Structures are given as structure tokens and as C-alpha cells.
Amino acid sequence: MITVNPDGKIMVRRCLVTLRPFRLFVLGIGFFTLCFLMTSLGGQFSARRLGDSPFTIRTEVPGSPESRGALRKMSDLLELMVKRMDMLARLENSSELHRTASVAHLAADRLTPGASLIERIQAIAQNVSDIAVKVDQILRHSLILHSKVSEGRRDQCEAPSDPKFPDCSGKVEWMRARWTSDPCYAFFGVDGTECSFLIYLSEVEWFCPPLPWRNQTAARTAPKSLPRVQAVFRSNLSHLLELMGSGKESLIFMKKRTRRFTAQWTKAAKYLAQKLGDIRRDQKQILVHIGFLTEESGDVFSPRVLKGGPLGEMVQWADILAALYVLGHSLRITVSLKELQSNLGVPPGRGNCPLTVPLPFDLIYTDYHGLQQMKQHMGLSFKKYRCRIRVIDTFGTEPAYNHEEYATLHGYRTNWGYWNLNPKQFMTMFPHTPDNSFMGFVSEELNETEKQLIKDGKASNMAVVYGKEASIWKLQGKEKFLAVLNKYMEIHGTVYYESQRPPEVPAFVKNHGLLPQPEFQQLLRKAKLFIGFGFPYEGPAPLEAIANGCIFLQSRFSPPHSSLNHEFFRGKPTSREVFSQHPYAENFIGKPHVWTVDYNNSDEFETAIKAIMNTQVDPYLPYEYTCAGMLERINAYIQHQDFCVGPSPLPPGASTAQSPFVLAPNATHLEWAQNISSVPGAWPPTHSLRAWLAAPGRACTDACLDHGLICEPSFFPFLNSQNSFLKLQVPCDSTEWEMHHLYPAFAQPGQECYLQKEPLLFSCAGASTKYQRLCPCRDFRKGQVALCQGCL
């Protein structure tokens, strides 16, 4: 039989008796809190506010004194409860000295729920504090609303019948049924009354006309724009490094890259400043939101930075940030959804309401992940401000995939399209899609002394394989061509591994493991050959190798890779066919720096290796991939691209008194007439336009390249008329306006001319043997394909 000290027994009984009413009281408080929350917020819980004391009621926001007083009393009572629990705990601890070990153990076990109870009380107190904040926000808006509503009469709050606002009555019906579906409506003052619906729909959104009895100064008006500040080139990048933040391996990599290129950015800024002279450049307010680095998107890149994962996106983003900053613009950089919401002015709720303030940014640079996040949280403001967005899009987005209605009707399926943006708002890593804007990145530019040192230090029989992940080395048939290469050259790899050599890498390959960027550069400076296995596509490494004096050898794809036959491209918003691992290197650089061969043909491969060993090349870097080239290009985009302006100059049915085109002397194409000035505000300038009728089955991209020119989609509206066909002496027995990404075009059977009905579908890409496409082309600057001769 166990004996129990009477004092200890009494102590335990007292604690248990004391705790029972506390439990009942806590249940009551919890039930009251839930009811209060549901009635005040339409059933929507507010997010927890981190960093505040769980017993702090924030009273700086004006609201209802009664509501705040009740919440304060609840919070004070909860605090008192916790203090009593603490006193009980101290009393119990002091009595332990007078108990036996067994009784102390029993009492401790019986009192354990007290600690859990304290935690529950603290959690309820935190929720009460959060509720107070939300209630204050709602009351702030609703009090203003009620004071204004009281000025009018009840019959003045009926949905008006105004033909200028055909959706008003339908929106009011929707608000009656769904206004509690998102707390953001209550945040803007909606309380379930007809007046609150109409005020919201006329002053926050724009579906209803302003109410005549409302004080119009109370409606939200855009603040007066401040005078523009002139952008000044920067040479010190230390503040940019602070703006970029830290904490992620991807950000650390980007900051290291920016530091390494600081001297080259500074030199490029001085060069461009002299080139532009006294041209005024307005400073833009720019938000850069790197969506793929947010936790909400998964941030799959950061964990792989140190394991040989792809770095192309981070290379490009680091260079974009540096270029924008060096050009003198004001930057905000976000890599989390919370930061994005704060900078945009997103109201609390589920993202159905517009922003609380006019968008404070002239431009927003983001990616597809960021684009999706903005659409989810900006409400109607996304449609209003999407013309300011620039989307960094590695592989490009063709117009047929961008136009939601057209893509859906014609089966252009994609995981990333349907945005209805101007296709030029998508910015690519390489200039493979003229429908988009070429953003690019930079590679290290060498001076003449460095180039000579590299040439003198080259090993004639050293090859480096392009591919840092072991999965790239799983290519079927690689043993065959690697055996041929091994006969002539020493093969080096930079494949990541933790402890054991990757089994995919043959024994005769000298694997250095994953190298830091400076050491990898040194390896390239010694090597003769940089060889690709067909993947990854269109990355920055081949350009870095060529810039360091290597010859790049890559595989020719037959048939070409595309979304129709290759898993990597499936779901991407493009039908582009890729004929090699790096089409830009093949088409814009070519031999002797770039060799493209059939790896399945051993004789062709071996012949190429022998020729490469006897070929001497200098380090080479296209101007458009230097710091100066990228600064020049981005500056031109910022100063001239404006996608918020009106529609195309020649809408359907329009005609001009005088055609701006003349037939070229050889009668092959159209040119802009010398006696007609360029269209004001048009960029590129219209005097650079050349129009050709492509052969059947030929895309405008290829038709322009055939003549040494670049397809320029912004010129399509000027050609989109029957006059253009007449000037080219093309007989049009009939002319039709339709929505099709291949128009304007001429169909030989029936002598039919087709004009484009939807400006967003003007497309350089796309071909059909049925049509001869009318193609707008332009010239371009040497080494800067994105800009025409007169584009600066």
C-alpha cells in the first residue's frame, strides 16, 4: 500500500479544482472568439501578425471604441489567467521540497496539463489581438462609408441603368450573393448594404457610374505625378548587393557574379554615356520580382546551385539587375510573395480586389511564376497594369500561344501561355523569337593582352565536356563518339559528386568535380574544345567557352527537337524547331568557333575533331553579349517600348489616303517612301521597314533572314491593308479580315487576301504551304540584332 503525504494530496486536489473552471472559461472564451470572428469578418480568419506580443491590442487605428474596449478586456482577462497559472506553478514548485520523491512525481504528472493550458490561452490571446487589428481596419473603412451613406437616401442606392456601364446591375447581384467570399470587400467598406455595393463598384472598381450624391473628392484619385528625375549612370554596385538580399544559395551566387563583373559594368557605363551624349533618360521606378526563387513556387534552383544544377536563369537575372541599376533606375527587388504583396499594395484577403493604391512602379520585371502570383493577388489591377510587366522567358512565347481565345480554339496547348500580353513583353535569353524582345545576359570580355595570354596557354589536345549533372552523361550512344574523341584529346569533366565518382562518367574522363566559376574559367582558358552532349539547350556556357578561346562542338538534331517530339519542350508556349543544342551559336557565330555535326555519323564526327585540332581561333564574344551591348539594348527598350499606348494605327476597315510604301526598284519588296516621314512614336522607326511576300510554307522569321534582315512584328499594323498587296502587284479577288496568326497572307488558290483582325496575333513565327505571308522586315546593327540602324 502506498502512503501519501496529506499536504501533497491537498495541494494536488486544489490545483485540479482550480483548473476545472479555467477549462470551462477557456472554452467559453474560444466560442465567443469564434462567433465574434465570423460575424465581424464574414467567416474569414485573418492571417497571424508575427512579431507582436500576444497580449498587445493595437489601438493606433481609429475604429469603434466599444469593440476595441471589449477586445482589450478579453485580452486583459487572459493575461490575468496566465499570471494565476504562473503563481500556481511557483507554489507547486516550492512545495516539492516537502514531499517524497514518489509524491512529487505523481503531482508533476497531474499538473502537466497546466502548461498546455497556458499555451492555449496564449494562442487565444494572439487570435484576439489579430482580430482587433482586422476589426480596426474594417471599421476604419465602414465608418467612413456609413457617414457618407447617411447623407443620401435609401432610394438613391439602386443599381442605375446606364448604357455606359452595362455590367453594373450584374455586378451588384454578384456582390449581394458573394461579398463575404473575400475579406477584401469588407476592407474597402462593403457591409452588405446596397449603398456599399454601389460605392465599391464605382469608386474602387469601375463597373458602375459614380453616385451623384457622393462627395467625389472621397473617391480614390491618382496622386499627381512627381517631376521625372533624370537617370544617371552608376559605377558603384555596393547598394545593389544590399538590395539583392541574402539567405539563399541562388542569391549568393548572383551577388558573387555581380561583384566579379563590377569593373566591366563600370567600363560599359562610361562607354554608353559617351555614345548617348546629351540624350535625356528618365529614371524609372522598377520592381524586380524573381518568382522562381519564392517559397510558394518551390524554389527548386537554390538547393541545386551547389550540386551542379542549372545556373542559366540566375546568370541572366544577376545581369538584368546589374544592368537596370547601372543605367540609373530606382529598383525594388523581391524574392518572396509577402514582399511582393507589400510593394504592390495588395489588400488583405484572397486577391479579388484591386490594389489599395495606384501602382507605384513604371515597370515590373518578373518570370512566369511571378506573373501567376501577381494575377492571383492584384485582382482587376492586374488587367489595368499588365502593360507595364516584362516577363523573362528563356525559350520564348509565340503569339498563337499567348492569345487565350485563339490558343484554346486552335489547340495551342501550353502550361505557360494564354496571357494576352503584347508578345514583345516576353524577353528571351537568345534572339531566337523576333516576336519577343531579346534580353540576353553577359559574358566576360577580354582585353587584347588577356586574349594573347589565352592563345599562348592553350593545350591543343584538351577537351571539356558541357554538363555538370551526372544525368546529362546518360546520353545513349555517348560511348561511341567519346571513344573517338579520346583517341585525339584528353577529356575533362566538371560533374558534381559527393563522395564517389559518378558511374555515368567513363573512367578515361578526368573529372574535376563541380568547380567555382573562376576555376571553371581557368579550365576553359586551357582547353581547345568545349563539347556538348545535346543538353542543356541554349545555355550561357558555350558563349563563355567561345569567349575564352574554345571551339564549341555540338550535335545536329535530325529531326529537329520541338514540342511535338521532345518531352523537354512539351508544354512550352512555342512551336519552334531546334536544329542543334545551341541554335544561336550555330546561326549567329558559326565556324570556325562553332561546329555542328551528326554525332551518330562516326566518320563526320572524327573528321570534325581532326579539323578542329588544326584550327586556330581567337577568343570571341558577340557585342550583344558584352556589358556595353546589354546596357545599350535594355536602355533602348526602357526609353522606347511602351505597351500601354492605344491600338494599332490601321484597325480593321481603315484606309489611308496615301500609301506610305513604294515598290523597290527591283520590284521584289516594299520600302517606306522617302517623302513620307516616320510615324511619330513608332519604334523601331518605320523608315527601316522592308516588306516581302514569303514563299508558300515559309515563316516570316526565315523569309527576312533569307534577305539578311530581321522580322519586326511591330511593323505588321502598317502592312495590314489591301494597299500593301496592291503595291506588291498581288491580285486580291477577295479580301477578308480574320483572326489568324499567319495573317496578313495571300492564298494562291482563289486569289484571296487575308488581313489580321486581332493585333495580338501578329506573328513572325508560323508557316503553311497554303499561304504566302506578308512579312515586315528591318535592318539591324552589327552585333546587336535587337536594334535597327536608327533605333538609338
Curated annotation (Swiss-Prot):
Lumenal side: 46-792
Intervals, Cytoplasmic compartment: 1-24
Keywords: Disulfide bond, Glycoprotein, Glycosyltransferase, Golgi apparatus, Manganese, Membrane, Metal-binding, Signal-anchor, Transferase, Transmembrane, Transmembrane helix
Pathway: Protein modification; protein glycosylation
Predominant place of localization: Golgi
Transmembrane segments: 25-45
Disrupted-gene phenotype: Brains from mutant mice display defective biosynthesis of O-mannosyl glycans. Mutant mice that lack both Mgat5 and Mgat5b display no visible changes in brain anatomy, but their brains display defective biosynthesis of both O-mannosyl glycans and N-linked glycans.
Reaction equation(s) it catalyzes: N(4)-{beta-D-GlcNAc-(1->2)-[beta-D-GlcNAc-(1->4)]-alpha-D-Man-(1->3)-[beta-D-GlcNAc-(1->2)-alpha-D-Man-(1->6)]-beta-D-Man-(1->4)-beta-D-GlcNAc-(1->4)-beta-D-GlcNAc}-L-asparaginyl-[protein] + UDP-N-acetyl-alpha-D-glucosamine = N(4)-{beta-D-GlcNAc-(1->2)-[beta-D-GlcNAc-(1->4)]-alpha-D-Man-(1->3)-[beta-D-GlcNAc-(1->2)-[beta-D-GlcNAc-(1->6)]-alpha-D-Man-(1->6)]-beta-D-Man-(1->4)-beta-D-GlcNAc-(1->4)-beta-D-GlcNAc}-L-asparaginyl-[protein] + UDP + H(+); 3-O-[N-acetyl-beta-D-glucosaminyl-(1->2)-alpha-D-mannosyl]-L-seryl-[protein] + UDP-N-acetyl-alpha-D-glucosamine = O(3)-{N-acetyl-beta-D-glucosaminyl-(1->2)-[N-acetyl-beta-D-glucosaminyl-(1->6)]-alpha-D-mannosyl}-L-seryl-[protein] + UDP + H(+); 3-O-[N-acetyl-beta-D-glucosaminyl-(1->2)-alpha-D-mannosyl]-L-threonyl-[protein] + UDP-N-acetyl-alpha-D-glucosamine = O(3)-{N-acetyl-beta-D-glucosaminyl-(1->2)-[N-acetyl-beta-D-glucosaminyl-(1->6)]-alpha-D-mannosyl}-L-threonyl-[protein] + UDP + H(+)
Location of this chain's protein in the cell: Golgi apparatus membrane
Keyword Protein transport assigned: no
Cofactor(s) this protein cannot do without: Mn(2+)
Biological process according to GO: protein N-linked glycosylation; protein O-linked glycosylation via serine
One matching Pfam family: Glyco_transf_18
Recorded family membership: Belongs to the glycosyltransferase 18 family.
Functional description taken from the UniProt entry: Glycosyltransferase that acts on alpha-linked mannose of N-glycans and O-mannosyl glycans. Catalyzes the transfer of N-acetylglucosamine (GlcNAc) to the beta 1-6 linkage of the mannose residue of GlcNAc-beta1,2-Man-alpha on both the alpha1,3- and alpha1,6-linked mannose arms in the core structure of N-glycan. Also acts on the GlcNAc-beta1,2-Man-alpha1-Ser/Thr moiety, forming a 2,6-branched structure in brain O-mannosyl glycan. Plays an active role in modulating integrin and laminin-dependent adhesion and migration of neuronal cells via its activity in the O-mannosyl glycan pathway.
Protein's recorded name: Alpha-1,6-mannosylglycoprotein 6-beta-N-acetylglucosaminyltransferase B
Species of provenance: Mus musculus (Mouse)
